[in-house]
């Protein structure tokens, strides 16, 4: 059975590559490309469903809960900071999503909103991932017992099945591939089991 921390780190690699694609798309918009609402909506949907509901959901509902039980403070320190940043990320994704959901020609205000929120969200999430990979996850790995890890791996599977729905994870990986492919990303994404 896969180790829970390894699963989360694999998901980070997928998210990073979609962030690269979003950055590439935003750069083209900055250089004059017309905003495509459908494309923006697809980025927002992926970031909401995979990065937030699926990935942050497993962290918040399973990993962080256990760390708090083990004595990590919830309100401050690494867990508190990660929760705060998850909240910030949600606000940016909601604003990006609002542009995707709009109708008619994109207004200059919407274009500005897309650029502002994407330009703030991408570095926020990249730094966030770095902090988890280099600080919080290693701390967690030291504190979690083998029993914790087994329980967590099973809880992750149940979360994928019950919260996300059967086959949803695979569909989100396919969506990540499409987003990467459309923005010049040609390397195959890491295969997820």
Language-model features, listed with the residues they occupy:
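Small-residue-biased structural context
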Residues: 1-193
């Amino acid at each position: 059975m896969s180790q829970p921390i390894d699963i989360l780190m694999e998901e980070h690699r997928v998210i990073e590559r979609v962030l690269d694609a979003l950055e590439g798309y935003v750069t083209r918009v900055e250089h004059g490309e017309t905003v495509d609402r459908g494309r923006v909506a697809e980025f927002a949907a992926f970031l909401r469903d995979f990065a937030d509901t699926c990935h942050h959901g497993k962290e918040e509902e399973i990993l962080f809960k256990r760390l708090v039980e083990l004595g990590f403070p919830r309100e401050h320190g690494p867990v508190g900071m990660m929760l705060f940043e998850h909240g910030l990320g949600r606000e940016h994704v909601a604003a990006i999503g609002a542009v995707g959901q709009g109708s008619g020609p994109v207004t200059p205000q919407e274009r500005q909103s897309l650029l502002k929120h994407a330009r703030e969200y991408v570095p926020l999430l990249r730094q966030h991932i770095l902090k988890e990979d280099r600080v919080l996850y290693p701390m967690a790995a030291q504190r979690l017992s083998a029993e914790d890890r087994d329980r967590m791996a099973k809880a992750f599977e149940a979360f994928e099945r019950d919260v996300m729905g059967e086959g949803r994870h695979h569909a989100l990986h396919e969506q990540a591939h499409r987003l990467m492919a459309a923005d010049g990303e040609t390397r195959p994404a890491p295969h997820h089991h």
